[in-house]
Each structure stands twice: as structure tokens, then as C-alpha cells.
Amino acid sequence: MAKKTASKKKSVSRKVTKTSSKKATARKGAVAKAAKKSVKKAAPRKSATARRPKGPVWQWSAVDTAAAIRSGAISAVETVEAHLDRMRAVNPRLNAVVVDLSKEALKAAHAADKQRAKGGELGLLHGVPITIKENVDYEGRPNFNGVPANKDYIAPSDAPVVRNLKKAGAIVIGLTNTPEFSFRGFTDNPLHGLTLNPWDPDITCGGSSGGAGSAVAAGIGTIAHGNDIGGSLRWPAHCNGVATIKPTQGRIPAFNGSATAERPMLAHLMSAQGPLARHVADVRLALEVMSQRDPRDPWWVPAPLVGPKPKGPIKVALAKIPDDMDVDPAVAAALRRAADHLERSGYRVSEVEVPDINGVWQTWCDIITNETMVMQEAAMLKVTSEDFHNAWNGMKAKANVLDLKAWMQATAARNGHIRAWQLFFEDYPVVLAPTTVSPTPGPRDDTISAERVQEVFWGGIRFISAINVLGLPGAVVPVALHEGKPIGVQLITGRYREDLALDAAAAIENRAGVLAHRLWETMD
């Protein structure tokens, strides 16, 4: 889920291959040296060494796409047209992109090509097609957030994450679907309808960034923006077989000028903006771009993107699963496979019990539910569907109702949980955990009953939602297919150590491969 206010809710693989350049200088926090070359030296003509990556343009990674455009191997216009063609070919059956921005995307692509022809500096994502989730402000457009009644909430300016992506030269080709108020783990709403999973229409694409996950998995855009307050980046990444990072709280700035009220404090402390992509290197590149300062977010933290490297082989804690969680054999096998990939990559993996995952999850559930009940519930229920009500009631049923004293005790308990995890990371810098222990549910399972909601959130994705209350970074990378459906694993690290999570994710990806390549064979 990714939550925002009821009146208007707002709700990275190691360094990429280095291109030859004597002037390529890695600034602090730099991660994509292939992309850095464009900032320092842009070629106005086609480079003698310009090469197009193999395969259709829409299948290229963001890193390769950016490099091809910089070198002149392809124009931004041709690139955007290829992605728009892909969108027209597959989106009608997926309903992942719900706002088509083809016209302005082509206009931006022409401008990008003119800018390159003039020479000079180019952004890290110059000419690269992306999508934005329809729950952050996009200047001049309603921020519907899945709710028809939000038609009058017109964005006065781009949200920080949109602005940062555009500043880097990215071209937005469409806005992706989200459930009402981005509050469900399943992507469906009365305004745009149900979004389908490109692997299998009988399983959910996840939520709330389900449109984002479905789109980028299917080849619509190279990077998809999303956000996460209870798993809304990591759950769709798992369901759609793509990679993501939920950054540390404060890493990426967030603000919606269309909102009529400020977000409650805990919503700030538990939520994060972030990217989904088919390649871990693309997630890392997008994280750098998205993380740039914006003065509108007082919670933004100027933390370096790369921290000190741990001494010796990195110890990974393979999280022991609580006894009350029924682990599907395919999930258990995927976790063992991921652990083996890490071991073969030089990590040292041990099965260890992590600090009080059950207590952490319950603290998350209690805080987010009670804050919503006080600040937003009444207004939300007036403008939402019966499906929303059913899903919300299921979550409420698992939460403890808190009075003021109990609320203060819960927020204090949060500090203790964070401290315990930070101390744990001193011994084990990386935690390998499941995204879910259960098979991926159906596309509308949270509307069946309150019990089914609890089965999904408490019984299935407990290790996802719990991390939000800790404010920790969590990456997801796909590991395997079971009966044609993707299974991902989660990598959790200390505060502002997204680099460690993404390094581990890249090590797994290097051995597991990019699952989306197998998806396309079945779609076309």
C-alpha cells in the first residue's frame, strides 16, 4: 500500500559498465559511470563507436538506452516511438497505463534530440522513456489517485520525483494505474478499472504500484516510478518479476501541491518514492536521479548514495520464518536459490532469526491503521467503492485500536525496533527475506473477506510491510519462475545503505538472469 491524505493522498548490481572516457569523474554518490559521461561530454554527432544494443528498442535497459542516445546510435524520437508502439500493442490487455502522454512525449523527444545536436551537458536519463504512477502531482493534470471524486485536484507543479526525473532528461510516456487512495495491495478502482499481470491474468499485479510493475515488465518504458508505505514497490515487483528498491525514509523527496492538507507524521516516516525496472542497474541509476534535493520536502536527507564497504566477505542473514507462517515450497526453494547465488558471489549466508518481525509488523499495522482512522477514514469512505471498504475493514480487523497513551507507546516502540535492527546490521549487513511466503493471490482477493486480507498481509507479505515502520531500504529482485509465475526475494539493509541492498540484488540477478526476457517470449 502507498497512502496519502484522504482529501488528496500522496502517497538500486554494482556500478554499470564504464564507458571509455578520460573525463568520466565519479562524484560522491555516483553510481552509473556510463551515464556520467553524458554529463561531462555530449557528442553532437554519431560517435564512431556508437552501437545499438541487440533486440527491439523497447527491450533495452535504461542504461543501454541512455548510452545509445548519447552516442547517437539512436535518436530520442525513435526510442520514444518504439515504446509508444509497445504501449499500444500490449496496454489494451493490461490496463497498466491509464493516461496516455504520447503527444507530449514525442514533443519532448524532439526537443531532446535538438538539445543533443547543440552539444553540451545531457542528463543521466536523456531521452529515456519512463512512466509515473498516478498518485503524485503531474503539472496541469488531476491527481486522481484512483478516485473519481479527485477530479478537481489539479497539480500546480510536478512532484519532486517527477521534476528530478525530467531534469535528468527522462521522457514520461504515460501515467500508471493505482487503487483508490493507493491503499490496497491490488490494483483496481472505479475510475480506470483492473490492471492485469502480464505473466498471468489470474494473479494480481500487486499494488499499489501495480500499474507501474505491470507496465515496465511488459516493456512499456524502461523505468517505472512508484511509492511504498506498506509494500507498494516491493509487492508489485515480486508479482510482475521485476526489480525495485524501497529507499530509506527521506532519501527521495516527496510533496504534492494539489493536496488540501499536510500528510500525518507517521505517513512521512514510513513511506518512500522509488523506481521499478527490469534490471537492477536501472534501479540504481533511477535511484540516483530521483534522490536529488527538493526544498519542498523538509524530511529529505542529503545522505551519500554509497557508504563504506564492509570488511571481509559480507555476512548475509537468511531470515528464519516465524512458525505461524505457512511457507510455500516454491518460495522456500527460491530463497535457497537466492542464498546459493549470494554464496557463489562471495557472500557468507547463515540462517538467522531477525529481530522480532512479528512485533515490528504489528507496530506498523497499529500505527498506520490508527493514524488513518483518525485523520482520513471518514473522508475516504465517502468517496470510495465497496471493494475499498472491504479491503480497509480487513486491515482494521488486524489492528489494535489505540488511545493517545497507547499511540505514544507504539511510536516509542518503533524506536526500539529500529535500534534492534541497526544493531543486528552490525553483524549482518544484509538480510535475505521473502517478499511473500505464499503463492501470488488472485487479482481481487482482498475483496473476498476480511480474513483473506489478513491472510495476504499478515500471513503472506509480513516481511514486506514490517520494513516500512523501520524506515529501512528494501530491494526486491526476481529469482525464479514457478508454474510460469515469478518469485522475488527481498534484501534489507541498514539506513541509507541502498548500495548494499542493490549490490546483493545484482549478484543474484547476474546468476538468475532477467526474468522479463522470458515473459516477452510468451506475450508476443
From Swiss-Prot:
- Note the superkingdom of the native organism: Bacteria
Q: Hydrolase among the record's keywords?
A: yes
Q: Which UniProt keywords apply?
A: Auxin biosynthesis, Hydrolase
UniProt-annotated catalytic positions: 133 (charge relay system), 208 (charge relay system), 232 (acyl-ester intermediate)
List the EC numbers from the record: 3.5.1.-
Listed GO MF terms? hydrolase activity
Which residues does the annotated region (Disordered) include? 1-56
Q: Which GO terms fall under biological process for this protein?
A: auxin biosynthetic process
Q: According to the UniProt entry, which residue ranges have a biased composition of type Basic residues?
A: 1-26, 34-54
List, alphabetically, the InterPro entries matched.
Amidase, Amidase_CS, Amidase_dom, AS_sf
NCBIfam families xref list: PRK07487.1
> Family per UniProt?
Belongs to the amidase family.
Q: Which PANTHER family match?
A: GLUTAMYL-TRNA(GLN) AMIDOTRANSFERASE SUBUNIT A, MITOCHONDRIAL (PTHR11895:SF7), TRANSAMIDASE (PTHR11895)
Q: What does this protein do?
A: Hydrolyzes indole-3-acetamide (IAM) into indole-3-acetic acid (IAA).
**Protein known as:** Indoleacetamide hydrolase
Organism field = Bradyrhizobium diazoefficiens (strain JCM 10833 / BCRC 13528 / IAM 13628 / NBRC 14792 / USDA 110)
